[in-house]
């Protein structure tokens, strides 16, 4: 059996849309950690969920297996593996992913954390800028938005409500 191109397989996995935020891909979110070839010839894709309790984890794994199997033409078994260390952080969202979120009315997490220990607290995005008008004069409406990883905010300048990805 020919050796598969792991970079092309990784690109196929990274192109899978996130089931909860379909405007971004798993690659945009930095969820696809590695693609390897197992001893038995199966392709294994390592995935790091955005947080341990993410309800989309199984759907993401199934979508990746389906996409990679289709990419390979069904010639190999495909497995996914959940990797929890290092823990996912919003720093892993690409600049392109942040742009896509903003363009679709979702405030991306702000800033990037400094190197060192990771805080064990979820920020509610007090500094979230409105994705419509850019104002930083926003208020928290609810700590929980349309998905568990978002909060609901409203802009004081333009009055629009919007989802904001919680900084982690």
Language model: regions and residue ranges:
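N-proximal, solvent-exposed amphipathic alpha-helical segments enriched in charged/polar residues
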Residues: 1-30
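Cys/His-clustered metal-coordination modules, chiefly Zn-binding fingers
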Residues: 95-168
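Short, histidine-centered active-site or binding-site loop motifs used for metal coordination
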Residues: 47-51, 84
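AMP-binding/adenylate-forming catalytic domain of the ANL superfamily
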Residues: 79-86
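Short, non-transmembrane amphipathic alpha-helical segments
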Residues: 51-76
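Charged, alpha-helical interface segments at or near domain boundaries
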Residues: 89-90
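Residue-level signature of catalytic and energy-coupling elements of molecular machines
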Residues: 13, 32, 54, 78
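Short edge beta-strands and adjacent turn/loop segments
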Residues: 23-48
């Amino acid at each position: 059996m020919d050796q598969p191109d792991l970079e092309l397989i990784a690109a196929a996995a990274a192109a899978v849309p996130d089931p909860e935020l379909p405007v971004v891909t798993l690659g945009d979110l930095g969820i696809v950690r590695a693609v390897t070839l197992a001893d038995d010839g199966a392709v294994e894709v390592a995935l790091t969920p955005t947080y341990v309790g993410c309800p989309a984890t199984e759907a993401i794994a199934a979508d990746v297996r389906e996409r990679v199997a289709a990419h390979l033409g069904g010639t190999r078994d495909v497995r996914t593996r959940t990797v929890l260390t290092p823990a996912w952080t919003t720093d892993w969202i690409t600049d392109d992913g942040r742009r896509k979120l903003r363009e679709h009315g979702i405030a991306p997490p702000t800033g990037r954390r400094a190197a060192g220990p990771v805080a064990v607290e979820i920020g509610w995005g007090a500094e979230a800028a409105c994705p419509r008008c850019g104002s930083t004069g926003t208020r928290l409406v609810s700590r929980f938005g349309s998905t568990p990883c978002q909060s609901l905010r409203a802009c004081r300048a333009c009055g629009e409500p919007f989802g904001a990805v919680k900084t982690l």
